[in-house]
Amino acid sequence: MNAEHSERLTAPLPWWLIAVGTGAFTGWLVRVATTFEIGLVAAVAAAAIALAVVAAYGAVRVQATPEGLRAGRAWLDRAHVGTIEPLDAEGWARALGREGDVRAFTLTRPYIRTGVRVAVEDPADPTPFWLVSTRFPASVARALGDGS
């Protein structure tokens, strides 16, 4: 029996703190040249924009079910799933580096150091495999099955 896997690739806490810091710094810069009130408005606006960017970047979902794999907006039907390889940090670095292929579909996040490589078994698709960031590569592989 295959389990299902669903995760949101949320940005880590330091990214959120940097977004807030961006707002504070922007407010200070504006305050130096104008008034406190205008600086405060600039700080709130800049922080809101930076936080929205971090939230949007981390809103991408990875879902693996017996029916297939969804990575962001992309979908790979189970009928086209080949070999599924969970990758630890070292394997992930190799897959994104010297073992990479420019034709591969990638959904990666720099703050997630593990992922899965899923071979694409569709003769009409030029994509050889998908590389998808996930904090739980074994869970994604388990949800998809063994690929045979």
Regions found by a protein language model. Name each.
Residues 1-33:
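N-terminal membrane-targeting/pre-transmembrane regions
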Residues 127-148:
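C-terminal/domain-terminus segments
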Residues 40-43, 48-49, 61-64, 94-99, ...:
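A short linear-motif detector with a strong N-terminal bias
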Residues 46-85:
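Conserved beta-hairpin
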Residues 20-27, 40-55:
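Single-pass alpha-helical transmembrane signal-anchor segments
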Residues 72-131:
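Non-transmembrane, membrane-adjacent beta-strand/coil modules in membrane-associated proteins
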